[in-house]
């Protein structure tokens, strides 16, 4: 299944409490359950004002549908074309 990186612009998101992150994750998981097994949240990276999420999904429309249901932005959705790591240099 295609992999996507979603950029979510969320001012001061890096300052949220553990409780707030828990509530946001629960809302996201509920939206995932409503959509079905064709979308999977792998993990997210939180910075000061953005969250970068990595998902598996059939297409961008499914990612946007999830964002709408969860009430969270999806400012940029980028399909992953290739992954590289230090072993790529070998």
Where are these regions (language model features)?
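A short linear hydrophobic-aromatic micro-motif
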Residues: 37-43, 76
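Short S/T/G/P-rich N-terminal loop/turn motif that feeds into the first structured element of a domain
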Residues: 1-33, 40, 50, 82-90
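Amphipathic, hydrophobic secondary-structure cores in small proteins
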Residues: 41-55, 61-63
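Short, flexible active-site loop motifs that bind/organize anionic cofactors or intermediates
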Residues: 11, 53, 67
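An amphipathic, aromatic/His-enriched active-site/gating alpha helix that lines ligand/cofactor pockets
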Residues: 56-83
């Amino acid at each position: 299944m295609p992999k996507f990186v979603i950029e979510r612009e969320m001012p001061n998101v890096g300052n949220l409490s553990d409780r707030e992150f828990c509530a946001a994750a629960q809302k996201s998981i509920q939206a995932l359950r409503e959509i079905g097994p064709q979308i999977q949240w792998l993990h997210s990276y939180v910075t000061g004002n953005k969250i970068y999420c990595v998902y598996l999904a059939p297409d961008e429309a499914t990612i946007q549908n999830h964002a709408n249901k969860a009430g969270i932005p999806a400012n940029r959705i980028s399909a992953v074309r290739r992954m590289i790591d230090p072993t790529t240099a070998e």
